[in-house]
Swiss-Prot record:
Protein name per Swiss-Prot or TrEMBL: Erythronate-4-phosphate dehydrogenase
Function statement: Catalyzes the oxidation of erythronate-4-phosphate to 3-hydroxy-2-oxo-4-phosphonooxybutanoate.
Stored Pfam families: 2-Hacid_dh, 2-Hacid_dh_C, DUF3410
Highest taxon, organism lineage: Bacteria
Species the sequence originates in: Escherichia coli O139:H28 (strain E24377A / ETEC)
Annotated family: Belongs to the D-isomer specific 2-hydroxyacid dehydrogenase family. PdxB subfamily.
Presence of the UniProt keyword Oxidoreductase in the record: yes
Pathway linked to the protein: Cofactor biosynthesis; pyridoxine 5'-phosphate biosynthesis; pyridoxine 5'-phosphate from D-erythrose 4-phosphate: step 2/5
UniProt catalytic activity: 4-phospho-D-erythronate + NAD(+) = (R)-3-hydroxy-2-oxo-4-phosphooxybutanoate + NADH + H(+)
The encoding gene: pdxB
Cellular component GO terms, alphabetical: cytosol
Major subcellular location class: cytoplasm
Subunit structure: Homodimer.
Residues bound to substrate: 45, 66, 258
Length: 378
């Protein structure tokens, strides 16, 4: 049994070798000759999986170690009798922590408290729900918009997108990309929406590039609209609009979900799905794969305020470390993918062990996802 895996899937060789012969290959472009004798294909979002790639190939199963699936033609796979699995929620925590890192940086730069802001969350799936929960731990008001969930009668106080645009100081997108249909998200943030945002609003896109109309956004910024912008995803990736990058406050190369934990979850989820598919079901404990974190432990004295939270968050991950490299190489062919391929190891907040002498600080940090304990000062 031959299993092709994307060379940038951590732990893929280690895990899938339990099931058969493993061949690690580039994801973009994928070497199609390797598909001629392969039984399974494990990809990331950079690989377009469709009839033109797999027609006439012996592939029986495709797994994507990503939450999103718009790079996979699921309808054709089903028609072709090819098994499929994604990794929903695998990188949700990472994306939430990316958003926090960005917001805390902007808050420090511009001198505002997040408690004074209302956050509109568009798309309330694995990422949106977790983001809402962490914001509410800190007492930050959130507004939710998710028409599919609202129409299904899912639990939640869902509002219209127009209401979020009217009332939110921060608008952050966490939707799939639907190019048509009743829940179309292609250019959901179009020129009309962007122009309607509150003066001084913050716009964040960490889902799919085409959810925000990049041309319209650049037009509005060029005309001087007072707007802070955080973009992790871009229309036309791996190409991007260099002029837009120059205008945004934070620009990164589609790495919001790139924690070691998130990548490992993606790999283990598709590994478990494939092992079940072939009748050799196996389960993997994530903590048996992950290395010890860079920071063993730190001590926090006193209560948790926004500047202290910012220091803790940026100790684990400061979004500016990914903004600067992209600006240096933007526009050079191949460099966008190279930044992603050679991405420095990044951990989640749970990797940081925080000893607090303040009980309320320890409680808040635990609810936020840190590994925190309370030890009263002596």
């Amino acid at each position: 049994m031959k299993i092709l895996v994307d060379e940038n899937m951590p732990y893929a060789r280690e895990l899938f070798s339990r099931l058969g012969e493993v061949k690690a290959v580039p994801g973009r472009p994928i070497p199609v000759v390797q598909l001629d004798d392969a039984d399974a294909l494990m990809v990331r979002s950079v690989t377009k999986v469709n009839e033109s790639l797999l027609a006439g190939k012996p592939i029986k199963f495709v797994g994507t170690a990503t939450a999103g699936t718009d790079h996979v033609d699921e309808v054709w796979l089903k028609q072709a009798g090819i098994g499929f699995s994604a990794a929903p929620g695998c990188n949700a925590i990472a994306v939430v922590e990316y958003v926090f890192s960005s917001l805390l940086m902007l808050a420090e730069r511009d001198g505002f408290s997040l408690h004074e802001r209302t956050v509109g969350i568009v798309g309330v799936g694995n990422v949106g729900r977790r983001l809402q929960a962490r914001l509410e731990v800190l007492g930050i008001k959130t507004l939710l918009c998710d028409p599919p969930r609202a129409d299904r009668g899912d639990e939640g106080d869902f509002r219209s997108l127009d209401e979020l645009v009217q009332h939110a100081d921060i608008l952050t997108f966490h939707t799939p990309l639907f190019k048509d249909g009743p829940y179309k998200t292609l250019h959901l943030a179009d020129e009309k929406l962007i122009r309607s945002l509150k003066p001084g609003a913050i716009l964040i896109n960490a889902c799919r590039g085409a959810v925000v109309d990049n041309t319209a956004l650049l037009t509005c910024l060029n005309e001087g609209q007072k707007l802070s912008v955080v973009l992790d995803v871009w229309e036309g990736e791996p190409e991007l609009n260099v002029e837009l990058l120059k205008k945004v406050d934070i620009g990164t190369p589609h790495i919001a979900g790139y924690t070691l934990e998130g990548k490992a979850r993606g790999t283990t989820q598709v590994f478990e799905a494939y092992s079940k598919f072939i009748g050799h079901e196996q389960h993997v404990a994530l903590d048996t794969l992950l290395p010890a974190p860079e920071f063993g432990r730190i001590t926090l004295h006193g209560p948790l305020d926004q500047p202290t939270l910012k220091r803790l968050v940026h100790l684990v991950y400061d979004v500016r470390r990914d903004d600067a490299p992209l600006r240096k190489v933007a526009g050079i062919p191949g460099e966008f993918d190279k930044l992603r391929k050679n991405y420095l190891e990044r951990r989640e907040w749970s990797s940081l062990y925080v000893i607090c002498d303040d009980a309320s600080a320890a409680s808040l940090l635990c609810k936020l996802g840190f590994n925190a304990v309370h030890h009263p000062a002596r």
